[in-house]
Regions:
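ATP-binding/phosphotransfer module of carbohydrate and carboxylate kinases, centering on a glycine-rich
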Residues: 6-152
């Protein structure tokens, strides 16, 4: 999401793309004064690209069509991941749990994603995670350790 947003900001800045509220919100957050300054921060590794996703959600909630398109594309990608999982597991009766603030918290993106899942994959049940991410990582590490001959 962040990478696509920065691409949109770059295109808006040099005239290859439409103006977007993402530019204004990012300028305000970075106190940069210009899209060129933001691009310099990206190239100098002084900008956490993933953090830009929250700005995209904010812009979408304000009705910015570029932000809405970015989130729509990314929600489609997550639905495609679920479809791939359905194919690999040969079942469409799955529970799906979200992890991460972008989709855990109620916002434009999480609502859009849930709506897309419900409309395209009606047998999928969205559930709360049984464990926090760290708990899941520990459980996975324990399973991997056991499978390679370690003590579990």
């Amino acid at each position: 999401i962040g990478r696509k947003a920065l691409n949109a900001v770059s295109k808006a800045s040099d005239g290859r793309g439409e103006e977007t509220l993402i530019s204004e919100l990012l300028d305000a957050k970075m106190k940069s004064g210009s899209s060129a300054s933001i691009i310099n921060k990206v190239y100098n590794d002084k900008l956490d690209v993933a953090s830009v996703a929250k700005i995209v959600i904010e812009a979408a909630e304000e009705g910015d069509p570029i932000a809405e398109d970015i989130l729509d594309e990314e929600a489609d990608e997550l639905v495609l991941h679920i479809k791939s999982l359905i194919y690999k597991l040969q079942t469409d009766n799955l529970n799906v749990a979200f992890s991460g603030s972008l989709i855990d918290n109620k916002n434009f993106y999480s609502d859009l994603l849930k709506q897309k899942i419900k409309s395209t994959l009606p047998k999928i049940k969205i559930v709360k995670p049984a464990l926090p991410p760290l708990g899941g990582a520990i459980l996975l590490a324990k399973r991997l350790s056991s499978s390679i001959g370690g003590q579990g």
